[in-house]
């Protein structure tokens, strides 16, 4: 049967086809991209050491002014910091990104390319061309690449632009279909190229007796994205000064981890994503750290206030503690998780 199946693949002419035991070329996730936040990594992948799937589309959605762009730029910074040869293609539809903004966020401007796009068709054509050019390189010459679209909600269509130019006020009813077609093609190409993409989008409250938060743009991105994260925020203050935001991240949809889980991450104006924020709550829930009155009891028996731990995280989140938290994250976020190695016994 094995020989027959290989003949079927050969004769079918489908370059993506493979026997599952050999790996599913465009489907298997063989690596993850660190987002710069351990708890956000866990929400997306079930591991504090994971993050964005390296060959999938991830959507980050929220209402206006929830920090979607700054959140995405924090991920971009961490991606570029992790590999000096990495590059970012940033499709931008809001005319909101400036060179100073990129430099102020600590992002290397020499390795980030901005593609201004107005329509879905422009984005689709240029994104596919980028991926095709990337795949045309010898595999050994391909450096890590990250694609971003900020934002989907601001993209028009060719028809809408033409109608506006002609003074017509008719609504373009084809936009959802054009988007769906674009993401159908991109999903497979990104999977094969092993290139991640993050798309920001807006949300709105649906009409009805029980209103729910919905993502704009039709069903195209909803079906194409492996994860959809809804963002909301509250201001982070140091005394009376606003120094950033606490971003509430809800896993609205995921093919890799449990849906409807929520975590908080901290995004500061000067440092971007806080790598350790959110781990304290996970440590408390799984008794890696035990809450005793207003302090936390550490495995060595010492007690510290939560603020002291967060102010010096590298001292307290040791390699052993991070291993226990990784086990906790697997249990908390992964489907059917239940590691044979228990969290309490991981240091035996």
Please state what every model-predicted region is.
Residues 25, 63, 74-75, 79-181, ...:
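Conserved inter-motif catalytic segment of the P-loop NTP-binding fold
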Residues 294-348:
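Terminal-proximal interaction/regulatory segments of ATP-powered molecular machines
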Residues 275-305:
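Long, well-ordered amphipathic alpha-helical subdomains in the mid-to-C-terminal portions
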Residues 172-286:
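Phosphate-binding/switch region of NTP-binding enzymes
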Residues 6, 10, 38, 42, ...:
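Solvent-exposed alpha-helical segments within well-ordered globular domains of core cellular machineries
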Residues 58-60, 89-91, 113-115, 198, ...:
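Hydrophobic/aromatic beta-strand patches that form the interior of the parallel beta-sheet core
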Residues 25-27, 39, 242-245, 252, ...:
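Peripheral, non-AAA+ core regions of ATP-driven protein-machinery
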Residues 2-111, 128-132:
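The Walker A/P-loop phosphate-binding site
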């Amino acid at each position: 049967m094995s020989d027959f199946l290989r003949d079927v693949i050969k004769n079918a002419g489908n370059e993506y086809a493979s026997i599952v035991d050999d790996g599913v070329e465009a489907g298997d996730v063989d690596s993850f991209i660190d987002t710069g936040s351990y708890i956000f990594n866990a929400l997306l992948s079930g591991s504090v050491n994971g993050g964005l799937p390296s060959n999938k589309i991830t959507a980050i959605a929220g209402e206006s002014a929830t920090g979607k762009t700054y959140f995405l730029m924090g991920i971009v910074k961490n991606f570029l910091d992790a590999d000096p040869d990495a590059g970012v293609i940033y499709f931008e539809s809001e005319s909101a990104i400036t060179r100073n903004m990129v430099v102020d966020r600590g992002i290397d401007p020499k390795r980030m390319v901005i593609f201004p796009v107005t329509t879905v068709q422009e984005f689709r054509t240029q994104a596919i061309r980028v991926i095709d050019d990337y795949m045309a390189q010898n595999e050994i010459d391909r450096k890590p690449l990250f694609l971003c679209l900020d934002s989907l909600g601001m993209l028009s269509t060719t028809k809408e632009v033409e109608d506006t130019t002609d003074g017509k006020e008719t609504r373009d009813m084809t936009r959802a279909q054009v988007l769906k077609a674009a993401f159908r093609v991109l999903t497979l190409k990104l999977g094969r190229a092993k290139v991640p993409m993050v798309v920001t989008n807006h949300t709105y409250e649906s009409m009805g007796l029980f209103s729910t938060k919905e993502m704009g743009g039709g069903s195209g991105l909803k079906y194409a994205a492996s994860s959809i994260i809804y963002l909301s925020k509250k201001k982070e203050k140091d005394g009376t000064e606003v120094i950033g935001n606490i971003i509430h991240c809800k896993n609205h949809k995921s093919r890799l981890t449990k849906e409807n889980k929520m975590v908080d991450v901290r995004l500061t104006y000067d440092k971007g994503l806080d790598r350790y924020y959110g781990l304290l709550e996970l440590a408390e829930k799984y008794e890696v750290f035990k809450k005793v009155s207003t302090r936390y009891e550490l495995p060595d028996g010492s007690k510290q206030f939560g603020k002291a731990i967060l102010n010096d995280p590298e001292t307290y989140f040791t390699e052993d503690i991070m291993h226990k938290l990784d086990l906790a994250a697997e249990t908390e976020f992964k489907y059917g998780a239940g590691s044979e190695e228990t969290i309490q016994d991981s240091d035996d």
